[in-house]
Amino acid sequence: MDELNTLSWVLLGLGALVVGLSKTALPGAGTLAVVLFATALPARESTAGLLVLLIVGDLFAVWMYRHTVDWAILRRLIWPVLAGIAVGSVFLGLASDDAVRRVIGAILLTLLAFTLWRRRRGSTMKPGRLAGYGFGWLGGFTTMVANAGGPVMSLYLLGMRLDVKTFLGTAAYFFFAINLFKVPFQIGLGLLDLQMLSIVAVLVPLVVVAAFAGRWLASRIPQRAFEALVLVLTAVGALNLLI
């Protein structure tokens, strides 16, 4: 990989700040970090660098929201998510960068349209067990191929009608476990090496600062505004992946 220029470092720094905020306040914003990293680095390699920063953010989110977790939801998602990760690792090894971005973008827009349709109808029904399996599989697949599982799971958790802190706590534990599970796959694909780790080390402080800022924000944001932000950020991230 070539030496990074000033613009690349700026994009990576912004991406690191987005990671911290997405973990403790704004789920769905993480897709913007995917775009920023993929712009600054080769797309496939960027997934490895971003993964390490996501794990750093996960550590803070797990600590901050350790008392507000819906464990029943997490147990339901385990096996479909693992299946999605397995399929995603094969796809990542075979697909081009453009194919990865477009597939994820198309999936997100489809799920977003379905979510908005349900909300427009005023449906108060929570997603059933079968829907949970489907979202779990898609969450595992998208998080493996592009670190873009956040929006998928955000849409699922919105449907479960969780309050802000339970939403963030459940998402924190989910992604901490999943991101750790992905590390051996990234190493096996040759994407996570010492050069990438040296780049990531410079960015870690930005994730930490943004994570604490996000914690402050999450305690002050109203439920309806939180849900609207999740939907808007998901849409923006999906469109960026398709462009």
Task: Give the ranges of each region predicted by the language model.
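Transmembrane helix exit motif
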Residues: 58-68, 89, 103-128, 215-216, ...
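Hydrophobic alpha-helical transmembrane segments in multi-pass integral membrane proteins
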Residues: 46, 88-93, 101, 141-148, ...
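Small-residue-rich hydrophobic segments that form or flank transmembrane alpha-helices
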Residues: 8-75, 136, 140, 150-211
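Residues within membrane-spanning alpha-helices of integral membrane proteins
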Residues: 9, 48-51, 105-108, 112, ...
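Interfacial loop-to-transmembrane junctions
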Residues: 212-233
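Membrane-interface helix termini and inter-helical loops of multi-pass transporters
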Residues: 1-3, 90-99, 186-198
